[in-house]
Structure formats: C-alpha cells, structure tokens
Curated annotation (Swiss-Prot):
Name of the protein in question: ATP synthase subunit b
Subcellular location(s) per record: Cell membrane
Membrane topology summary: Single-pass membrane protein
Protein function: F(1)F(0) ATP synthase produces ATP from ADP in the presence of a proton or sodium gradient. F-type ATPases consist of two structural domains, F(1) containing the extramembraneous catalytic core and F(0) containing the membrane proton channel, linked together by a central stalk and a peripheral stalk. During catalysis, ATP synthesis in the catalytic domain of F(1) is coupled via a rotary mechanism of the central stalk subunits to proton translocation. Component of the F(0) channel, it forms part of the peripheral stalk, linking F(1) to F(0).
Keyword annotations from UniProtKB, A to Z: ATP synthesis, Cell membrane, CF(0), Hydrogen ion transport, Ion transport, Membrane, Transmembrane, Transmembrane helix, Transport
Gene from which the chain derives: atpF
Amino acid sequence: MLWKANVWVLGEAAHGISGGTIIYQLLMFIILLALLRKFAWQPLMNIMKQREEHIANEIDQAEKRRQEAEKLLEEQRELMKQSRQDDEALIENARKLAQEQKEQIVASARGQAERVKEAAKKEIEREKEQAMAALREQVASLSVVIASKVIEKELTEQDPAS
C-alpha cells in the first residue's frame, strides 16, 4: 500500500525519468517564459516605466511649485520689508513735521504774547497818562477853587464892614 501511495505521489518519477519528457517540459517552460515576457513582462514594465515617469513629472512639478512658492514668499517678504521702511519713513517725516509745526506754533504764540504784552504796556502807559492828566486837571481845578476860597476868605477878613 505504501508503494501505491508513492507511485501516486511521485507519478512516473517513481518508475524512472524520461529524457524526452524533460526536454519537452524544458521547451514548454522556455516558450512560457517567452510568452510571459512578450505579453506580460513587457507591458508590465511599460506600465511601471509610465508610472515612474508620471511620478517623476509629479515630483518635478511639485518642486517647481515649491520654488515658485518660495520665490513668491521672498517677494512678499521684500514687499513687507519695503512697506515697513516706507511706513517708518512716513512716521519719521510726520514726527519731523509735527516738531516743526510745534516750534512754529510756539514761536508764533511767543510772538503774539510779546505783542499782546507790548500792547498792554502801551495801553497801561496811555491810561496812566490819561489818569495823570485827569489828576492834574482836578488838582488845577481844586487849586483854583481853594485859591478862590482863600482869596474870598482874605477879602472877607479884610473887609469886615461889608
């Protein structure tokens, strides 16, 4: 029974190997390899090559997009830097202008204050002169009144009979 199982498992190999069978199987294997190479291997390699080219193109495009993005980023950074410099220049100019205007306003205010002060001094002097003139007038008129009373009194003292 064991012998029958071996024949069944090993087939003809258990009885001996035939040279024609080996050549036939080798020839069929070579034909199979040639057919596989022509109909399976070559198309498979073409597909793999196309896939490789596609992936390489995608990588190249991604690299180009990355370089463009970096270029745009650098341009944006330059624009931002220029914008900041322009802003700083504007702010500095505004500060200078404000300082100049402040100095002009202060100088103008001082000049105006000086003019007002001089006008006030002149007004005070004029009013002082007017007051002095009015005072002289009053003194003169009081002097005349007093003098006339003194003269009248002297006259009445000299003329007791009247």
